[in-house]
Design a protein with these regions (language model features):
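Soluble "head" domains of membrane/secretory-pathway proteins
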Residues: 2-19, 38-41, 51, 55-240
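N-terminal, active-site-proximal structural segment of metallo-dependent hydrolase catalytic domains
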Residues: 45-48
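Hydrophobic membrane-insertion alpha-helices, especially the h-region
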Residues: 20-38
Length: 240
């Protein structure tokens, strides 16, 4: 039986190749996690609050606004984010300090290797996927679960679909026949005007009130991302 022996030069070349492969993989993951931590994030819708347009298990690519929090001296009024009525946004209602870059990078790595099924940050944050309806200066009201918006400077209000830049359908709950429309969350809401840096977000399924009807208007810093693309399921893949 013959034995094969490689020369010292061959072994050195092989080790050199292995080091380059390991270094390449390391650079790829560091670049990926840093990039996704600062500029993009992938999220899974875990409930039916956005029915009938979005379904539980849908997976999305969001643009991330979190990198603005790393720039010192940027106030809410100076955050250069172009938010549009009707867009799907990522809302973080966590009241504490935002996770740092290291935490986000580590979280991105864990999310990558677990196919977005586990997150360190989401255990500490309150992350929601919602529909953005109102911008600063808008007058917001609700009639029979349909939001009406009077855009700042306009003399009259329009329905949310008329002012939206995106097409979507809302799901209106069926209330009991004797339900009092004056009760909270009955589908009606008196007009109010959004202040500076205030936004109104809501669920497409109006039976779910875990939105601005409960929280009140949200700050630009609560809106941490804008949905760009649904990549799963494949049958629904496309821009939002």
């Amino acid at each position: 039986m013959k034995r094969r022996y490689s020369s010292y030069s061959d072994q050195k070349t092989q080790r050199h190749k292995i080091r380059w492969v390991v270094a390449g993989v390391l650079v790829f993951f560091l670049s990926y996690t840093s990039f996704t931590s600062l500029f993009f994030s992938m999220r899974v819708l875990e409930n039916d609050t956005m029915a009938p347009n979005l379904s539980p298990g849908d997976r999305f690519l969001f643009s991330s606004h979190s990198y603005f929090s790393l720039v010192p001296g940027i106030g809410d009024e100076n955050i250069p984010v172009n938010l549009r009525r009707g867009s799907v946004v990522l809302v973080n209602m966590f009241r504490g300090s935002s996770p740092g870059l290291l935490s986000r990078t580590l979280d991105g790595t864990i999310r990558f290797f677990t196919a977005q099924n586990f997150s360190l940050i989401e255990q500490k944050e309150n992350i929601y996927i919602k529909r953005l309806i109102g911008l600063p200066g808008d007058e917001i009201s609700m009639v029979n679960y349909v939001i009406r918006v009077r855009v700042e400077g306009s003399a009259f209000s329009l329905t949310e679909n008329e002012v939206s830049e995106y097409d979507y359908t809302i799901e209106i709950p069926q209330m009991p026949a004797l339900w009092d429309s004056a009760l909270p969350f009955s589908g009606n809401m008196d007009p109010f005007i959004l202040g500076k840096n205030e936004y109104f977000v809501i669920s497409d399924d109006r039976s779910n009130t875990n939105d601005s009807r409960t929280w009140g208007p949200v700050s630009i810093r609560n809106i941490t991302g804008t949905a760009l693309f649904r990549y799963w399921p494949l049958s629904s893949m496309g821009r939002l």
